[in-house]
């Protein structure tokens, strides 16, 4: 990592952007292991996610969110190296990687916080690869947009401190965007 820029900061949380050389072999490793727009439960209704997803871990049985358990697939050597590298760079104990694939600008994820039961919320790190999309931050108290951050390839977004309790984040619909985007999100899972 060569540089870091702070884009959001409060007394108890922050969002930093870091430079990183991402190994594209990780894309090859996960490409065929992602579930295409799997089901989740939102407000008691079954619906499909608007992106493809996969969860990779050698320690966690899976990632439970929105009423469903996504079972973990084993880490490949490339993913294991990437996970170890993130833990060294951020002095964390991440043990799982959630991979999202956005096919184009109609794929999205709504405003949310990574604060589900079973994950430690003080550090969440995400690496982007592919087409630039908007990573939108909103204040939880009034839902106002705090920042629109371009997800440039190889950039790390590091949400730390109480960020998940103070803010939401999302990848909004951007109909004009045609390209593919992957995100690799690192967390510590206790299940």
Locations of regions flagged by a protein language model:
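Non-heme Fe(II) oxygenase metal-center motifs and adjacent flexible, charged/small-residue loops
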Residues: 1-191
């Amino acid at each position: 990592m060569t540089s870091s820029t702070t884009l959001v900061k409060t007394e108890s949380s922050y969002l930093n952007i870091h430079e990183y050389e991402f190994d594209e072999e990780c894309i090859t490793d996960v490409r065929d292991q992602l579930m295409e727009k799997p089901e989740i439960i939102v407000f008691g209704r079954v619906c499909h996610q608007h992106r493809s997803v996969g969860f990779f871990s050698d320690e966690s049985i899976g990632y439970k969110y929105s009423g469903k358990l996504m079972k973990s697939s084993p880490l490949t050597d490339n993913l294991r190296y990437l996970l170890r590298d993130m833990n060294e760079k951020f002095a964390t104990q991440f043990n799982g990687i959630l991979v999202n694939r956005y096919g184009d600008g109609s794929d999205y994820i709504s405003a949310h916080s990574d604060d589900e039961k079973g994950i430690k919320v003080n550090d969440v790190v995400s690496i982007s690869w592919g087409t630039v999309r908007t990573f939108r931050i909103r204040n939880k108290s009034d839902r106002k947009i705090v920042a629109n951050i371009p997800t440039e390839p190889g950039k790390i977004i590091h949400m730390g401190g109480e960020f998940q309790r103070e803010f939401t984040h999302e990848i909004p619909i951007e109909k004009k965007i045609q390209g593919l985007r992957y995100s690799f999100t690192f967390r510590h899972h206790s299940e």
